Amino acid sequence: DSEFPCPRKQQPAGNSECSYYCEMNGQWKLGKFQNGARCDYNAVKDGVCNEGLCYASGDSASNTQNQGGSRRQENEDQGDDEWDRK
């Protein structure tokens, strides 16, 4: 998957995101957590991850109203534990 070149992995405990960044060959790339993981859509853990994006519970992946709030930008303040290096 060219949009998500990092390996798919399990969502860490306490994490409510659907995607993460990893370092590949000196560049930061996007990866996704497993489908079905709980995520924050509008509130705490009220959504479900599908292919790296967070959808409202009960919505399908084809829903065009996805807020896309699960993708963090690289420059957002987050601890080193959120990043994986390859």
Swiss-Prot record:
Give the source's domain of life in one word: Eukaryota
Chain positions covered by the region annotation Disordered: 58-86
Q: List localization entries.
A: Secreted
Q: Does the keyword Magnesium apply?
A: no
Q: Would the keyword Secreted be found if you checked this record's keyword annotation?
A: yes
**Any one GO cellular component localisation term in the record:** extracellular region
Comp. bias (Polar residues): 59-70
Q: Which GO terms describe its molecular function?
A: toxin activity
Hey, what tissues is this thing expressed in? Salivary gland (at protein level).
- UniProt KW keywords: Blood coagulation cascade inhibiting toxin, Complement system impairing toxin, Disulfide bond, Hemostasis impairing toxin, Secreted, Toxin
Q: List the disulfide bonds.
A: 6-22, 18-49, 39-54
Compositionally biased intervals (Acidic residues): 76-86
Q: What does this protein do?
A: Inhibits lectin and classical pathways of complement system activation in the host with no significant effect on the alternative pathway. Inhibits host extrinsic blood coagulation pathway but not the intrinsic cascade. Binds to neutral and negatively charged membranes in vitro; binding is reduced upon pre-incubation with Ca(2+).
Q: What's the protein name?
A: BaSO(4)-adsorbing protein 1
Question: What organism is listed for this UniProt entry?
Answer: Ornithodoros savignyi
